[in-house]
């Protein structure tokens, strides 16, 4: 069996897990880990029986693909030599720290004939996969993604760190261009926004409201979708889905409950029948399969030419473009006295 030769560039808190998973794959050879901190690089290399390299250039000729998991501001520097050499790259999200750089990386991939995949791991969350199966033609989507301040990814704000997950998810669900964006946010800990709210209006008519924050005592990752077929709520942490849809009688005659109420002497008693008689409720527990493993499996298959990556550079850049519009919309908002958001962002 020919093993696919992969390296991991950056073995911090996330990169070490990429290395662990790839090292355990029988059909993959973990060629090495690239890490500028020698102690850390040698530690992870020893742990997974591979080699340590101090720079990306040292492994370009040895690999078919790489996973780039360095801080966002270093993405372009770390990935350029691989893309130019035609090597496949899976870039952790977001593609880059700004849209112009993200576009340049995608153009570099196209010019070099290289595969560029973006690590939007929530696309591989079994709860989202199940949600996507259940939902057709969404009309309204609401996403909530909040967490405590972890002191990770402090080189970017909450829009590029957290909200971009949900931007990409709703784009996958709606499959329509974004027509308009309204947004606001706040800088609390700084230097970037720690809280953001955005409303996306799609050309299809669908609307999505997104909330992201990293100043909350407890983590939450939920997505709720309303469509003509009913309502689905997914908890992306517990992977539990709850859905409601009208019973056949209601579905066949929208508005029929008005007639039922009119014909009932005590209409307030009907409330006990809503979720037993008129709306059918279903609870589903999605698989506990590891999303990061599934994402890396997708990347390896794409490197071999067996499939198109689920989230290509094109989709990753599209999510970045919407994220930039969210940030632009926040320029007139600030809850930090004397420091308009845009001034704080430019200073950072």
Feature locations, PLM:
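A contiguous active-site-proximal alpha/beta segment in oxidoreductase catalytic domains
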Residues: 96-153, 338
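A short helix->loop->beta-strand "cap" motif at the edges of active sites that frequently abuts
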Residues: 50, 85-87, 112-115, 206
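Beta-loop-alpha module in the N-terminal Rossmann-like domain of NAD(P)-dependent dehydrogenases
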Residues: 18, 48-107
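N-terminal Rossmann-like dinucleotide-binding module
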Residues: 1-48, 170, 346
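C-terminal helix-rich "cap/oligomerization" subdomain common to oxidoreductases
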Residues: 67-68, 284-286, 291-348
């Amino acid at each position: 069996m020919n093993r696919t030769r992969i390296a991991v560039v950056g073995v911090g808190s996330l990169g070490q897990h990429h290395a662990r998973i790839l090292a355990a794959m029988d059909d993959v050879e973990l060629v090495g880990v690239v890490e500028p901190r020698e102690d850390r690089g040698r530690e992870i290399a020893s742990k997974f029986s591979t080699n340590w390299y101090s720079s990306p250039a040292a492994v370009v000729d040895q690999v078919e693909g790489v996973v780039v998991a360095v801080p966002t501001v270093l993405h372009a520097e770390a990935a350029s030599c691989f893309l130019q050499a035609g090597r496949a790259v899976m870039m952790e999200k977001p593609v880059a720290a700004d849209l112009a750089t993200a576009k340049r990386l995608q153009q570099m991939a196209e010019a070099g004939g290289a595969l560029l995949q973006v690590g939007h791991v929530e696309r591989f969350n079994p709860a989202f996969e199940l949600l996507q199966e259940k939902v057709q033609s969404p009309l309204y989507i609401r996403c909530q993604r909040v967490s405590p301040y972890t002191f990770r990814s402090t080189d970017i704000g909450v829009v590029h760190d957290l909200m971009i997950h949900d931007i990409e998810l709703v784009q996958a669900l709606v499959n329509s261009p974004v027509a308009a964006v309204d947004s606001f946010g706040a800088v609390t800990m700084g230097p970037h926004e720690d809280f953001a709210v955005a409303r996306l209006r799609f050309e299809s008519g669908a609307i999505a409201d997104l909330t992201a924050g990293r100043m909350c005592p407890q983590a939450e990752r939920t997505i709720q979708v309303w469509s003509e077929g009913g309502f689905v709520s997914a908890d992306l942490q517990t992977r539990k889905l709850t859905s409601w849809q009208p019973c056949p009688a209601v579905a066949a005659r929208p508005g029929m409950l008005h007639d039922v109420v009119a014909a009932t002497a005590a209409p307030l008693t009907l409330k006990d029948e809503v979720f037993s008689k008129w709306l059918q409720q279903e609870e589903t527990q999605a698989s506990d399969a590891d999303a990061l493993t599934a994402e890396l499996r997708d990347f390896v298959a794409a490197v071999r030419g067996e499939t198109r990556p689920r989230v290509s550079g094109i989709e990753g850049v599209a999510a970045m473009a919407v994220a930039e519009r969210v940030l632009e919309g926040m320029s007139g908002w600030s809850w930090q006295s004397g420091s308009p958001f845009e001034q704080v962002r430019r200073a950072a």
